[in-house]
């Protein structure tokens, strides 16, 4: 059986993002065109569908790391802030973006909140595993793994 660990992350995330676009409960908010993904970024994302890509990446991250909280996900999506001539410092990613995307994934039934953080539901696990199986069929060279 194919799992998330058997396929490249970028191909899986793009496939899941396409499927999340069709989900009625995962929608990009109105403010999505005006925000950066963290204080360490200078510009907003160039991809117009970046909300679905981030939601797919969060779903994969909850699958791999769960139970996981918003704060640790902020650390994962953070980066170095350019402070001019001063040394760079690490800054965490946007919590509002992560929180809202996780809430939408909860409404879809793909993840659930527990005491220690958010974990993937059986529906979410099968959703990701099916997407991984489709990616594995499409990409040549992955069949032998």
UniProtKB/Swiss-Prot annotation:
GO terms, molecular function: RNA binding; structural constituent of ribosome
Domain of life of the organism encoding this protein: Archaea
Lineage: Archaea, Methanobacteriati, Methanobacteriota, Methanomada group, Methanobacteria
Gene name of this polypeptide: rps19e
Keywords: Ribonucleoprotein, Ribosomal protein
Role played: May be involved in maturation of the 30S ribosomal subunit.
Organism: Methanothermobacter thermautotrophicus (strain ATCC 29096 / DSM 1053 / JCM 10044 / NBRC 100330 / Delta H)
Pfam families in the cross-refs: Ribosomal_S19e (PF01090)
Family matches, as InterPro entries: Ribosomal_eS19 (IPR001266), Ribosomal_eS19_archaeal (IPR027548), Ribosomal_eS19_CS (IPR018277), WH-like_DNA-bd_sf (IPR036388), WH_DNA-bd_sf (IPR036390)
Record-given protein name: Small ribosomal subunit protein eS19
PROSITE patterns, per the entry: RIBOSOMAL_S19E
One record GO biological process: ribosomal small subunit assembly
Annotated signal sequence range: none
Subunit-level organization: Part of the 30S ribosomal subunit.
Family, per entry: Belongs to the eukaryotic ribosomal protein eS19 family.
GO cellular component: cytosolic small ribosomal subunit
